[in-house]
Swiss-Prot record:
Gene3D superfamilies listed in its UniProt record: 1.10.8.60, P-loop containing nucleotide triphosphate hydrolases (3.40.50.300)
Residue segments, region Disordered: 1-37
Name used for this protein in its record: Putative cfxQ-like protein R730
Protein residues bound to ATP: 173-180
Low complexity compositional bias, start-end: 13-32
Entry-linked InterPro entries: ATPase_AAA_core (IPR003959), CbxX/CfxQ (IPR000641), CbxX/CfxQ_RuBisCO_ESX (IPR050773), P-loop_NTPase (IPR027417)
Species of the source: Acanthamoeba polyphaga mimivirus (APMV)
């Protein structure tokens, strides 16, 4: 449909009028026999004339509808499809599902023809697939994988009217076992399930919440909680609060503020406490027994076995695009089996060991003409890296280590 407009006249550089007047005065003062000069600085006036403006014919304009995102990795989105993924018979005879089963079921989702299996919505599993794969690929952690799987099944079946209020969690385990990594995955899962409005993780050490004077701790704690709305608040190093026999005024402010917000802001954020199980009980829950009941889930990460330590070392080597000497794999495995107790911080210690091993390797091959052996770690590299690792950890005697197995 057309709409008519009055002709629009627009003048650009209206200051040309004043320039014209000035130039005219100057020309009058010129001598009669002098050639008239042309003012090259004068800008021309430009006029735009629009007779009418025409709108697009909206009645004939095609509208584009964006289809919803489908998370099915084998889905063709066809309501008449003949290639719907087949659910294996094994699932009909199962009485208990594990993490592998949930991942497999998520891969069988079809947005038109296969949306549910029994009481489980397959689309939600399809959405969670990448996060579940990430969790499943972690080395060890069998106990926590089983616990998270049970939690997921409960929430997937929508049996809880207010699931956001039930997600406060305790993750216990020694340093270096991967608590932070598990927290990241949990936050990712809760976000994809719609329980969080953002994936933000706010990690706070409890001693950072204790103020410099009485009345200062509560605002610090409240600020940390407010910054976690829509995401996850992680409270680490709970032993900083103090033991059950002694609770100062600063620590009491922190605990009371946390407890109050778990009620007043229920469902608006998830609180996760990380640390040793004994420390969490004695230094946190012992001060306020009401707190314990607010944390419905308690996940434990066990210490790593020697074989798992080797797998962690091997994985870190591969992630850095290095290699282990294939001819010495068994000897390297034995090294971790006989020195497992020398890595009390597990993953952290393995990372440090790998760094010193790389340094030892570079010094060993510095004059080596065979570039094909570069970045291939052998037992000697690990032995020398381990010696440096132990020295940095203030170990005084190599006799404490089982180097006889090197």
């Amino acid at each position: 449909m057309k709409r008519s407009h009055d002709s629009i006249t627009r003048s650009i550089n209206s200051d040309n009028d004043s320039e014209t007047n000035m130039n005219s005065d100057n020309n009058n003062n010129n001598k009669p026999n002098q050639r008239k000069k042309i003012n090259l600085n004068k800008k021309p006036s430009i006029f735009f004339i629009f007779d009418d403006l025409t709108d697009y014919e909206t009645e004939n304009k095609e509208t584009t509808t964006i289809p919803p995102i489908c998370h099915g990795i084998h889905c063709d989105h066809d309501p008449n499809s003949c290639i719907v993924p087949i659910i294996p018979d094994k699932f009909n005879n199962m009485t208990r599902l594990n993490l592998d089963n949930l991942i497999e079921l998520g891969e069988l989702f079809h947005c038109k023809l296969q949306k549910n299996f029994r009481n489980i919505p397959l689309e939600r599993l399809a959405i969670l697939r990448e996060s579940l794969l990430k969790l499943n690929k972690t080395i060890g952690m069998n106990s926590i994988k089983e616990s998270i799987c049970e939690q997921l099944i409960y929430f997937l079946m929508d049996l809880e009217p207010n699931p956001q209020e039930m997600l406060h969690t305790v993750i216990q385990g020694p340093p270096g076992v991967g608590k932070s990594y598990v927290i990241d995955i949990l936050a990712e899962i809760y976000l994809k399930m719609g329980y969080l409005s953002n994936g933000k993780i706010n990690k706070v050490k409890l001693d950072e919440l204790k103020g410099k004077y009485i009345g200062h701790s509560a605002p610090l704690t409240q600020k940390a909680i407010d910054n976690s709305i829509g995401g996850v608040l992680v409270l680490d190093e709970v032993y900083a609060i103090g033991n059950s026999d002694h609770l100062d005024s600063f620590s009491k402010e922190v605990i009371d503020t946390i407890n109050r917000n778990l009620t007043e802001k229920a469902g608006k954020f998830v609180c996760i406490i990380a640390g040793y199980g004994e420390q969490i009980d004695k230094c946190f829950f012992a001060h306020n027994e009401g707190l314990r009941s607010r944390f419905r889930f308690r996940f434990s990460i066990d210490s790593y076995t020697p074989e798992e330590l080797f797998e962690i070392f091997k994985l870190k080597v591969e992630n850095d695009k290095w290699k282990l000497s294939e001819s010495e794999i068994n000897l390297i495995t034995d090294f971790f089996r006989f020195n497992r107790d020398k890595f009390p911080y597990f993953g952290r210690d393995i990372e440090t060991l790998l760094f010193h091993t790389k340094v030892a390797h570079s010094n060993r091959i510095v004059y080596n003409d065979n570039s094909g052996l570069n970045k291939t770690i052998n037992l000697l590299d690990i032995k020398q890296g381990f010696a440096k690792f132990s020295l940095n950890n203030k170990e005084t005697s190599n006799n404490d280590f089982n180097l006889m197995y090197l």
